[in-house]
Amino acid sequence: MNAQTGIVHLVGAGPGAPDLLTVRAARLLARADIVFYDALVHPETLALAERAEKIAVGKRCGKHSTLQRFINKRLIDAAHKHAVVVRLKGGDPMLFGRAQEEIDALQAAGIQCEVVPGVTAALAASADLKISLTRRGMSRNVTFVTPRVGEGEDASDWIRSACDADTAVLYMAAGQAASIASTLIDHGLPADMPVLIVENASLPQMTTMATTLDALRSITERMTHGGPALLMIGRVFQREVDAQDAMSVDDAVLELLAIPLSA
């Protein structure tokens, strides 16, 4: 490493709640000279970098964001000017965060880098819901997958991964939930497979909808409100679907009781 270059720290900001940030991440933010942050980073987390210059670099699914090659260049340029450079990413940097592209670019430029892990949304949702993603006799494996396919990638890869998993968590998928449900059923998953749609995991405004693949593929209205959302699929979520069905029956009974008897 050139003696005049700083270190770039790829830091996981966690799933949203500021108090789920790691101690190491908080200490780095306090020392940072400059922070390049993603769209989903909580303002209270960003506020920990009191002395740092803060630069938004987008990276929100489906919306305008800074091109990755420009982010890479800005990180390299910043390392030549500052001692502590933080690249702050939602969740964990190494999971759907394009961290490897940044690491490769930094190493090619002779810049030292460090990765600080963060709590990913799937684990935050599991904790909030008090539902283990693995369960003896039911789920021996968990797959984290995204249906977003890049140039040269085969869509069948993510489909196969989701279908083979005991428990599958799909990131960046809520906007196409109905078509995903149809695709998974067409490729062999049971129509009654439980699904949870979890939005804003770890935050006070977190919402959860329990359903099945069959019901999900028939839903046409928007199911989320713009926050980061997960599709969580597997038999470990059966209890939540059963509870939702019971509530639906109770609501139907109440509606019937409210109908006045005809004369």
Task: Outline where the language-model segments fall.
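Acidic/glycine-enriched edge-of-secondary-structure segments
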Residues: I55-L67, R135-T146, A168-V169
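A contiguous loop/helix-start segment that scaffolds small-molecule binding in enzyme catalytic cores
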Residues: N2-V8, H80-V85, N141, V149-A263
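Short hydrophobic/aromatic-enriched beta-strand-loop microsegments
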Residues: E53-K59, G110-E114, L133-R140, G188-I197
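Alpha-helix N-cap/helix-start and coil->helix boundary motif
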Residues: H42-P43, T120-A122, A177
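Class I S-adenosyl-L-methionine
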Residues: M1-V116, A215-R217, A229
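Hydrophobic packing residues within well-ordered alpha-helices of enzyme cores
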Residues: T45, L106, A125-S126, I180, ...
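Class I SAM-dependent methyltransferase SAM-binding "motif I" and its flanking Rossmann-like core
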Residues: M94-D164, T207-A210
